[in-house]
Amino acid sequence: MPLTNVIYCGVCDFPAEYCEFSGKFKRCKAWLQENHPELYTKWYGDVTEDVSKQLAESSIGDEREEKLEKALEKLERKQQAREERELAKKLSSKVVIRREARTKRKCMIAISGLEVFEIDMKKLSKTFASKFATGCSISKNAEKKEEVIVQGDLADEVEAYIHSLLEEKGMKEVKVEVIDAAKKKKKAETTTTPGSENKK
């Protein structure tokens, strides 16, 4: 079986028969006409067409393609810079899981800082409600930002789930801070118990 001699285009580096998919078709055709006229005739017609007209059109095509390529490169650079800024913002942000006392024996978990990571809060709330079989809702904190409220002492379980969720999004390095406000409150109440000053 004879080997097939593949002609590669000097403009786009594709096999010559695939130049139309390169985005540089006019320049590719001009190159093919100059370097392989027999293939040009076979694929695109008679070589005896007005060469000067072809070259002129090719020149105009070159300018248009160059402008288009530059515009695309500029757009890609802007997009890349935007993505880098967004990634830096995400990596420098943190998720806060706060354990708060509701009554003496009951507490709730408030999760904030998720909006930066494009996490669907409603979906997450439903996931927590079904996963932990508990009440779950969305409210706004003192900073007017949304947070997920989970009823029950589930700080460890919530933390583990948030870590796995961030890891799925490629955000493994993001800090997850757990604050036990219930303990702090209890400690503060203990230190200010009436009569405690007289015992010193």
UniProtKB/Swiss-Prot annotation:
Pfam families with a match to the protein in the record: DENR_N, SUI1
Taxonomy of the source species: Eukaryota, Fungi, Dikarya, Ascomycota, Saccharomycotina
GO biological process, one term: formation of translation preinitiation complex
Keyword Cytoplasm: yes
CDD domains from the UniProt entry: DENR_C (cd11607)
Family statement: Belongs to the DENR family.
Record protein name field: Translation machinery-associated protein 22
Organism: Kluyveromyces lactis (strain ATCC 8585 / CBS 2359 / DSM 70799 / NBRC 1267 / NRRL Y-1140 / WM37) (Yeast)
Xref: Gene3D superfamilies: SUI1-like domain
Compartment(s) of residence: Cytoplasm
Domain SUI1, residue spans: 95-166
Keyword Glycosyltransferase: no
MF (Gene Ontology): mRNA binding; translation initiation factor activity
Assembly, per entry: Interacts with the 40S ribosomal subunit.
Record-level GO cellular component terms: cytoplasm; ribonucleoprotein complex; ribosome
Domain remark text: The SUI1 domain may be involved in RNA binding.
SUPFAM superfamilies named in the record: eIF1-like (SSF55159)
Keywords in alphabetical order: Cytoplasm, Ribonucleoprotein, Ribosomal protein
